[in-house]
Amino acid sequence: MKIYRRAAITVALFALLSCTDEPHQGSTAVSEISAKVDTLDEKIKSAIVGYDWQLTLDHHRMAQKENSYTPPSIATIFSDPDVNSRILENNSQLIALDLPFKFLAYAEPGGNDAILAYTSAEFIASRHDLPASLLVEYSERLDSVLNLVENSTISEVETEQIGKDFAIVKIKSDFDFETTIERLKETINSLPDTIWFGELDYQNDAKKIGIELNPTRLLLFGAPEPGAKAMNSTPKLGLDAFCQKLLVFEDEGGAVWAAYND
């Protein structure tokens, strides 16, 4: 399907442009830094035990299963339906591409320290031209996690070059919402070496708290081997580039769109 092929090209380009022969530490050093990353990730998870929707992507260990290598890196994603819904209510559905909350515990190639990156409120505000007041609850949830780690551990995401709709590709579908979702899933699941991680139905979550949203759903999937090659020298790519996020939504006029990070 055209939409998925274009998203898959992004993975392929990362793989082609990344160094596949990047040297990495010996097994003892890797085990030691991996333990530090695990400990940092456990702190994140201890702060989100009350959230029903959670997803963990251990990029390092998924790469090992494919006989590939990327430095220790674990992405933790969790969803707060109240926060998501209030941000999306009466605002662009494209914001959902940067929701829900995502943290990445990782180490740089050859590094000895565990680092934490996350999708900040400032990033979302810049990319979607939102007032800071709309993201107060989002920031509060972030702080409840960030307060558990040392400031020196945190790697900030630069926002100076981020403008409205920065690096977002949007494609109009020829099909209705449910058919688009079905065709995308069929295509994704038919591809070798591609893993389906899950989906998040923003409309359904909003309905539970009395907020009306147009159909909006986030699909999560990835290919560990090319992902590992891309992240080999730049593991921080695991914050937004991997896994792949494909947002499908129906706008006010009834048109169906698919959007993803370029």
Roles of regions detected by a PLM:
Residues 3-10:
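Sec-dependent signal peptide recognition
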Residues 15-18:
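C-terminal motif of bacterial Sec signal peptides marking the signal peptidase cleavage site
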Residues 20-22:
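Bacterial signal peptide processing site
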Residues 28-34, 124-135, 169-175:
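Second-shell loop/turn segments in exported
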Residues 32-55, 174-198:
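Amphipathic alpha-helical segments
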Residues 61-99, 197-198, 202-244:
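Compact, glycine-rich, soluble single-domain proteins
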Residues 110-144, 247-262:
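A short, solvent-exposed beta-edge/loop patch
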Residues 135-178:
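Surface-exposed beta-loop interaction hotspot
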